[in-house]
Amino acid sequence: MSSYMDLVDDEPATLYHKFVECLKAGENFCGDKLSGIITMAILKAIKALTEVKKTTFNKYKTTIKQGLQYDVGSSTISFVYHLKDCDELSRGLSDAFEPYKFKIKSNKEATSFKTLFRGPSFGSQKNWRKKEVDREVDNLFHSTETDESIFKFILNTLDSIETQTNTDRQKTVLTFILLMTFFNCCRNNDLMNVDPSTFKIVKNKFVGYLLQAEVKQTKTRKSRNIFFFPIRENRFDLFLALHDFFRTCQPTPKSRLSDQVSEQKWQLFRDSMVIDYNRFFRKFPASPIFAIKHGPKSHLGRHLMNSFLHKNELDSWANSLGNWSSSQNQRESGARLGYTHGGRDLPQPLFGFLAGYCVRNEEGHIVGLGLEKDINDLFDGIMDPLNEKEDTEICESYGEWAKIVSKDVLIFLKRYHSKNACRRYQNSTLYARTFLKTESVTLSGSKGSEEPSSPVRIPILSMGKASPSEGRKLRASEHANDDNEIEKIDSDSSQSEEIPIEMSDSEDETTASNISGIYLDMSKANSNVVYSPPSQTGRAAGAGRKRGVGGRRTVESKRRRVLAPINR
């Protein structure tokens, strides 16, 4: 066998020697070994000024191996290559490996003029299958955005993982990859290549604290960051997912992806886990999206987050979060954006919006929901000084990770898990990230109303009974202080600063108003829907999904609050 690692560091003389040794076996030569040597020789010659990537090597090696032949009598080696004109390549290899000769054919089919002129048009049929797949993906993502919220899609996929996995380890890994790639708008390989030694704690005004890690080896070889933060939907909490991952999996030595030398020693998980992730959803498709041949699996998180932010008219944030370039004013669910990793600074409100602690109002401003107390409760006591007992506990809890990841980060994770793990299955309510402001419902202090009206909060997509605390918040929101105003958050807020765990938690007092937003299913957010404010004794109307999709009703209460139907 001839693998990438066996050949990537070889000099020309070494490759020539291995080539001759392989052909001494005559017709019984090893096709895998010979195709690997030829592929590496071609890539080293053509890409003399760039790097030779492992993925490129494996792709071209497969093409060469499929049509590789050796004529012992004439010492001629023939194979098929992906270039359209292979004459120059044939001459070059014949000169480099003389006295052997090369006969290379192109796998690009020549266009027949006879066929071309007999056809109905000169339209190009190139990449027809890719266009067909893109069209299928766009259609399915469009239906996901209208008939079913993207967060509901994630929740259903998590349910599929829980019911179809055989081991806790498999469930933990699949859940981890799904959530991280979605909330970071990244490829699976970006998550895999996270350098565990770069984890650090960062303070954020809108979610309390973040964990940040660096990806040094991306597709463009420009580093980017991956973020972990609390999510208001309990099952999506990224801190808890990271804790479970560290407890279940062991660190993996960094795999070599190119001929360039990297100082990184460890990566987050093995390459095979990405393959297992794709195979799982191919075998157990939780949605028609997974059933598309060559459909988005490794890029699923990127597709979903692009669609979600595009739906909320926040495309520029998708570009910053995922480091994708976009100059097109169109839907991005196809994820056709170019790669422009450049370590862009992210606006702090982005994390509050994704976490569900902030929403986007009709004017396009990101506004707080007055949930600072809830956020502070998540981190109460977590940033206290270390003690000697915890030093021993993190080694027992996280094993080999304790030798790689910062001790401050692991203590932070362990304390957060101990305090908040019970939240995970208490309440599975999904929250909208968008305000609707209509004639019948006006926000506190808004123009056009004689007196400031109380804000209305409509819970959506409840997957079970709301917790007592959630019910109290709902009732309290109906009697919110009329004098409170919505705090508009400047998207150009100052950048987050790194906070070591030894420091005490000294957060600045914020002036966010204690106001609750209108909660509506994101997939049905429509300006044509008008809501009347509830009576003093009445109950806020519930919003769910249309009957036939999950078996729930769409505002079917006897005391219906909807005055105008949703336009489809």
Swiss-Prot record:
Bias kind Low complexity: ranges: 444-455
Any matching Pfam family: Flp_N
Source species: Zygosaccharomyces bisporus
Residue ranges of the region described as Disordered: 442-517, 529-568
Record function comment: Catalyzes the recombination between the large inverted repetitions of the plasmid.
Active site: Y339 (o-(3'-phospho-dna)-tyrosine intermediate)
One Gene Ontology biological process: DNA recombination
Source species, domain of life: Eukaryota
Assigned keywords, A-Z: DNA integration, DNA recombination, Plasmid
Database matches in InterPro entries: DNA_brk_join_enz (IPR011010), Integrase-like_cat_sf (IPR013762), Recombinase_Flp_C (IPR005626), Recombinase_Flp_N (IPR022647)
Gene coding for it: A
Domain Tyr recombinase Flp-type: 132-420
Compositionally biased residues, Basic and acidic residues: 470-491
Name of the protein in its database record: Recombinase Flp protein
GO molecular function, one term: DNA binding
Family from the record: Belongs to the 'phage' integrase family.
